[in-house]
């Protein structure tokens, strides 16, 4: 559409016209019974809400999460003709809100890279979590903290999804750990801003993770942040 409207597929100055045209065509095709694939980053619920609300009520909406480990995303970006850079990828991952059925989604599918081995990925994440919090709010290392959360959930008979979320809810902390406060100043204690978003993204790589478990990981800080 970008090339059609301007003659240049890389023209970033006509985004408004591009999306207006795209949404108009999607709406028309759906009304005529034609299936559509809407390929966009859509990292937050708000990002996704516009196109979902645009769909007629009779439409079945599938969300396909085209997933890859963060480092693979960065490597792939370096090989693209038009790159965005690691900083942009970091910001996007730290905004991620896992897709869930209450958004109007009928089915959620996760597309992993060819040759991806979940067991090896889980082992790597498990090893990476064995770091100190260096923060007064936690006395255990990240790994031990998650193990304790899982043990509590299991002993109290919580659901499989809650147990899954408990063991992996802080898996993104090693990626986010920084001795910098929210104002960008050096800090003596570590901070883990937006680790819940990174943890939710990383959790797609684990075997048998349900959409509910991943959603729970993504919202587990809402109570403390006053978000919803």
What are these regions (language model features)?
Residues 58-76:
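Conserved phosphate-donor/acceptor-positioning beta-strand/loop module used by diverse small-molecule
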Residues 122-148, 174, 178-188:
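Active-site flanking loop/helix segments enriched in acidic
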Residues 71-121:
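Conserved GTP-binding G-domain of TRAFAC-class P-loop NTPases and closely related GTPase folds
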Residues 152-228:
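Divalent metal-dependent catalytic cores for phosphoryl transfer on phosphate-bearing substrates
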Residues 35-37, 161:
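Residue-level preference for the first positions of well-ordered beta-strands
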């Amino acid at each position: 559409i970008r090339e059609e409207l301007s003659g240049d597929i890389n023209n970033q100055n006509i985004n408004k016209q591009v999306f207006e045209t795209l949404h108009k065509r999607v709406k028309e095709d759906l009304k005529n019974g034609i299936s559509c694939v809407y390929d966009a980053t859509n990292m937050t619920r708000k990002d996704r809400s516009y196109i979902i609300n645009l769909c007629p009520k009779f439409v079945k909406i599938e969300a396909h999460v085209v997933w890859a480990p963060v480092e693979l995303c960065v490597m792939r970006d370096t090989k693209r003709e038009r790159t965005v850079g690691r900083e942009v990828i970091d910001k996007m991952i730290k905004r991620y809100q896992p897709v869930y059925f209450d958004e109007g989604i009928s089915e959620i599918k996760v597309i992993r890279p060819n040759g991806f081995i979940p067991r090896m990925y889980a082992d790597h994440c498990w090893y990476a979590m064995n770091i100190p919090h260096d923060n007064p709010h936690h006395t255990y290392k990240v790994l031990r903290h998650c193990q304790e959360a899982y043990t509590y959930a299991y002993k109290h008979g919580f659901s499989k999804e809650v147990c899954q979320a408990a063991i992996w809810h802080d898996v993104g902390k090693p990626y986010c750990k920084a001795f910098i406060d929210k104002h960008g100043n050096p800090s003596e204690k570590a901070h883990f801003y937006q680790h819940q978003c990174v943890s939710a993204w990383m959790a797609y790589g684990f075997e048998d993770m349900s959409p509910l478990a991943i959603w729970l990981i993504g919202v587990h800080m809402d109570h403390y942040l006053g978000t919803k």
